Each structure stands twice: as structure tokens, then as C-alpha cells.
Curated annotation (Swiss-Prot):
Annotated compartments: Cell membrane
Keywords: Cell membrane, Glycoprotein, Membrane, Transmembrane, Transmembrane helix
Protein's UniProt name: Protein unc-93 homolog A
Glycosylated residues, chain numbering: 190
GO cellular component: plasma membrane
Keyword Transferase: no
Major localization listed first in the record, in broad terms: membrane
Membrane topology: Multi-pass membrane protein
Range of residues in the leader sequence: none
Keyword Transport: no
Region annotation (Disordered) ranges: 438-457
Residues spanning the membrane: 8-28, 42-62, 65-85, 86-106, 140-160, 202-222, 257-277, 291-311, 320-340, 344-364, 395-415
Similarity field: Belongs to the unc-93 family.
Length: 457
């Protein structure tokens, strides 16, 4: 196996192991630690840390440590989060969440930079077009990485499946589930017995082991790389703090970006709702915590499959059709969740919603990044720093108000953000279509550069 492909596979399986652990834990935070809103407070803090670090930390760390050791250091932050869950309290989870937030932006920036460098190295070696090889390597990475949502949630459901079978849930309790839930943000998940501490420790032990394996795999087998510099140029230095910070906000002078910041915020809002509210107020409330993993498997599988499908489909349809599909799908889900009264007798419905949600999320993850890559090609670093910043802000706001609002209100907020984001996107699409080079949608997909393909934590 040639060296560059080996490095891509090492990176991919390292992320698979890491996010098998983190993804499963994130899905359970709001259900396991619902007392006083600790779970959602931890997630809000996490994304707050990411929001701040995304403005300046990634280029500084990558410049000082290189991509490989930035990846290893950032992964250690995720392992610390798993360890913090062993003794979950405000004094352990909140600092651990800050660490993950600080490491997340650096992790994804280093991942994108590394894949771009090895893709271009392979292209020079074989005489291929650079962007084609980079696109191929990103495709391999996400094909492997996206399955982490399946494995992490499968592990949690199998472990918690050892819990004693609970009795019939009282009808009056079911009436408080779903959009009607206004109490479970501050009360324990009362629809199911909390898993025994032994089961929780077993799950955390498995997740922590996956994290340590990821760090070990990257530290031992991933080869360090450096971006090739044109002849006569000095080695590229990490930009100073103020330069990075200012370039991020200076790009907001562009009217198109000011309109498009609603798209990454929507991505943050909708992911936060599914992992923080749907898992707790619909699944845990009506079925039990042991079903959280299974419903999130549907989300992860649908997201992964549709990401691959939409990436190919966009070449033929353009982005506009896919944005419309994502908006209509998410709109239908929001309206249905407002009206639906979850009940254990409707078991298949619990899996349909996250599957459709995953399809819509696949649109936002693939097409938002492609859109930013095309519109702001000359300022891609600042553009994607803005993307990470505004998506993180969406997470922070959504998790921040999670303990204070009824689920129905959160759904109306999400509906408003979706409507505003689509209106803003339509305005940009219309403006671009009037330019001499034709409609933006005709641009098809363009392989993203330097971390421009994924912003998920």
C-alpha cells in the first residue's frame, strides 16, 4: 500500500475510534445528567470553547506542532472528556468540556489540512489533478468516519440493554413527553430507571479505551507531513493571533457572508436539538435510555449514506435542489414533532424522525461547505473560521436555553432559524445568478480545501 493512502486510512480509523466514543457520550449527556441541566450545560460549554478557539487556535497550533501532533494533542482533550464522565459533576464535566471545545477546532482544521497536503503530494507523485486526489481522499475519510455514529450508539444500547425491563409507563407521564415536555430539563429522566453505576462505568471504560487506541494509532502510525513551498519561498509561518482574528471578522464586510452565517447556525441548532432534546424528551421519556443509541444509529447511518449520495448528486442537480430538499425535509419533521405525542406503541416512528433528520443534516454538512468553498475561495481560511464560529454559536445558544424552554418553544425557534436561513440563502443565490458568470447553482460541487469539508465535532 502506498504511503499517502496508508496515512489517510490511519487518520480515518483514528477518527472512527475517537468519535465512536465521543459521539455515543454526546447523545447520552442530556439523558444521563438531566439533574439541574448538567448534561446540556456541559455541551453548551463545550461548543462555547470551540467558538472561542476557532478564531485563533488552529493555525497557531498547526504552525507550532505540525498537523500530526496537533491531531494527537486534540484527541487527548476528547479522552479527558470520557474520563470526566466517570465522576460526573459540575467540577469535572465543565472543565473537561472546555478542553474538548478548545481541541475540537484544532482537530478538524488539522484533519482538513493533513488530507489536503497528502492529496496534493500524491497528485504530484502520480501526475494527477490535485483537487481530484484531495476529493478522493476526503471521500475515503468520511466513508469510514461517518460510521462512528453507528458504532458508538450501538455500544451504548447494547450495554444499557442489560438493564432490568421496566414496567408500563403511566399515561400521565407519557402526556408530558415530546413537545409538551417542560419539566424534564430539571428533573431526572423519570420514564426509566437510571442505569446502574456498574453499567455506566462499563460503557465509559469501553469509550475511554477507544479514545486511547485512537491517540496511540495516530502517535505511532501517522507520518508527519509538511506543505510543499514553492521554490524561493521561506517556510510558511503560523499567522500571528491578531492577524488571524482580524481576518476572520474582516470577511464579515462581505454582504454574502453576513447573510450566509445563518446556515452554519442552523446546523448547530438542528444538531443540538436532536442530540439534546429528541433523545431526552421523546426517546428516553417514552421508551427509556436504552433506546437512545438505537435511534441515533438511524441518524448516523442516514447522514453517512446521504452525504455520499448528495455529494455525487450535486454534480447533476446543483446545490439549489438539495438545499430545497433539506429545508422541506426538516420543515416536515419540525411540524410533525410539534403535533406528535410519542407513545411506546408507535416504536417505528421513533426511528423514522432521526433518519429524516440525518438526511437533512447531510445536505447542510455537504452543501454548506461546498457553498462557502466556492464563494470565498480567495479567503477560505477566514471563511471556514467563520463557519466554525457561527456553527459553534448555534450549538451554544441551543444548549444554553435547553434547560429553560419547553420543547415546543425550541421547535418554533428552530423553525424560525430554518426559515430565515433559507430566505438568506435564496437572496445570495439570486444575487449570484445575476452575475455574468451564471447561476451559483450551476457551479456544481467543488472539492473543499484545507478543512473545508467538515465542521462537526
Amino acid at each position: 500500500m502506498e504511503g499517502n493512502l496508508k496515512n489517510v486510512l490511519v487518520l480515518s480509523f483514528g477518527f472512527l475510534l475517537l468519535f465512536t466514543a465521543y459521539g455515543g457520550l454526546q447523545s447520552l449527556q442530556s439523558s444521563l445528567y438531566s439533574e439541574e441541566g448538567l448534561g446540556v450545560a456541559a455541551l453548551s460549554t463545550l461548543y462555547g470553547g470551540m467558538l472561542l478557539s476557532s478564531m485563533f487556535l488552529p493555525p497557531v497550533l498547526i504552525g507550532k506542532l505540525g498537523c500530526k501532533w496537533t491531531l494527537v494533542l486534540a484527541m487527548c482533550c476528547y479522552v479527558a472528556f470520557s474520563l470526566g464522565n466517570f465522576y460526573a459533576s459540575w467540577y469535572t464535566l465543565i472543565p473537561a468540556s472546555v478542553l474538548v471545545g478548545l481541541g475540537a477546532a484544532a482537530l478538524w482544521s488539522a484533519q482538513g489540512t493533513y488530507l489536503t497536503i497528502v492529496g496534493n503530494m500524491q497528485a504530484r507523485k502520480t501526475g494527477q489533478v490535485g483537487k481530484d486526489v484531495v476529493s478522493q481522499y476526503f471521500g475515503i475519510f468520511f466513508l469510514i468516519f461517518q460510521s462512528s455514529g453507528v458504532w458508538g450508539n450501538l455500544i451504548s444500547s447494547l450495554v444499557f440493554g442489560q438493564m432490568p425491563t421496566q414496567g408500563t409507563i403511566p399515561e400521565e407521564q407519557l402526556q408530558a413527553c415530546g413537545a409538551s415536555d417542560c419539566l424534564m430539563a430539571t428533573l431526572s429522566a423519570n420514564s426509566t430507571n437510571r442505569p446502574s453505576q456498574d453499567l455506566i462505568y462499563t460503557l465509559l471504560g469501553i469509550y475511554t479505551g477507544c479514545g486511547f487506541l485512537a491517540v496511540l494509532l495516530m502517535a505511532v502510525f501517522l507520518e508527519p507531513v509538511r506543505d510543499a513551498q514553492p521554490e524561493g519561498e521561506d517556510e510558511k509561518q503560523a499567522p500571528p493571533f491578531w492577524s488571524t482574528l482580524l481576518s476572520t471578522f474582516k470577511l464579515l464586510r462581505d454582504k454574502r457572508l453576513r447573510l450566509l452565517i445563518l446556515l452554519p447556525m442552523l446546523s448547530g441548532f438542528e444538531q443540538a436539538f436532536l442530540s439534546g432534546d429528541y433523545t431526552r424528551s421523546y426517546t428516553t421519556c417514552a421508551l427509556g435510555i436504552q433506546f437512545v443509541g438505537y435511534v441515533m444509529i438511524c441518524f448516523g447511518a442516514a447522514d453517512a449514506l446521504c452525504s455520499v449520495l448528495f455529494g455525487r448528486l450535486a454534480r447533476h442537480t446543483g446545490r439549489t435542489v438539495l438545499f430545497a430538499l433539506g429545508a422541506v425535509t426538516q420543515l416536515a419533521c419540525i411540524i410533525a414533532l410539534l403535533l406528535w405525542k410519542p407513545h411506546p406503541s408507535q416504536l417505528p416512528v421513533f426511528f423514522v424522525f432521526p433518519s429524516l433528520w440525518g438526511m437533512a443534516d447531510a445536505v447542510w454538512q455537504t452543501q454548506n461547505n461546498a457553498l462557502f468553498g466556492v464563494l470565498f475561495e480567495k479567503n477560505k481560511e477566514a471563511a471556514f473560521a467563520n463557519y466554525r464560529l457561527w456553527e459553534a454559536l448555534g450549538f451554544v445558544i441551543a444548549f444554553g436555553y435547553s434547560t429553560f424552554l419547553c420543547v415546543s418553544v425550541k421547535l418554533y425557534v428552530l423553525l424560525g432559524v430554518l426559515s430565515a436561513a433559507m430566505a438568506a440563502y435564496g437572496a445570495v443565490e439570486y444575487t449570484e445568478s445575476r452575475k455574468a458568470d451564471g447561476p451559483l447553482a450551476a457551479g456544481r460541487t467543488k472539492p473543499a480545501e484545507d478543512g473545508a469539508t467538515q465542521t462537526k465535532l
